[in-house]
């Protein structure tokens, strides 16, 4: 009888051990499955957070799109409320009646010259909607934009509603290129000007690309035979370009 009891007792203990092992295995398996399920959730949250952070990292910090793309044509009288600082070459814009004479100031400006208090004084005298600063070939030799940056800062402080446009230097004819001034030099200046405009959050107008010929130079058909004066039709084309590229 004792032998049977011992056998029964041994069976009971062995079954209990098997049950314990099975339960332990089931518990471990459940933990493992829960752990696996947790991983995708964690990855999902990470991906969502990463997506938000990525948008923030690559978000364009400027509010301008440069070069300014083509837009609807400006309303009549648009040039009555703008101020333009430009090289002497651009005087034709007022000579042919597109821009009022009182709104166009011409001279051989460099970035340093433009910075003078004259521009701020002009703006202070009238509520202009926009300021256009044209760059000429004289700017090629002086590519320091620190003074221009100061001017833009001053204008933004005094006239927060004024839109600022930096207009690229235009190409020159093949027969006016020299060792110290080429169309490649002008393109280099314009590249720096575009970069400066983006960093300063101001508008940039690519007038150079609008006028340049297939050979990378100003076509003779757009300019007078002598000097750097442009044809009347070219000035009218430039005026229309400005009126159809409003930021």
Would you name each region that the model predicts?
Residues 30-83:
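N-terminal, intrinsically disordered, polar/charged segments of Gram-positive cell-envelope systems
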Residues 69-150:
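Conserved SGNH/GDSL esterase-like catalytic core that processes O-acyl groups on lipids
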Residues 1-12:
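N-terminal Lys/Arg-rich, disordered targeting/topogenic segments
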Residues 15-31:
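Hydrophobic membrane-insertion alpha-helices, especially the h-region
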Residues 136, 156-187:
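Active-site segments of SGNH/GDSL-like serine hydrolases
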Residues 148-153, 190:
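Generic structural signal for well-ordered alpha-helices
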Residues 33-35, 172-173, 177-247:
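Catalytic His-Asp segment of secreted/periplasmic serine-dependent ester chemistry enzymes
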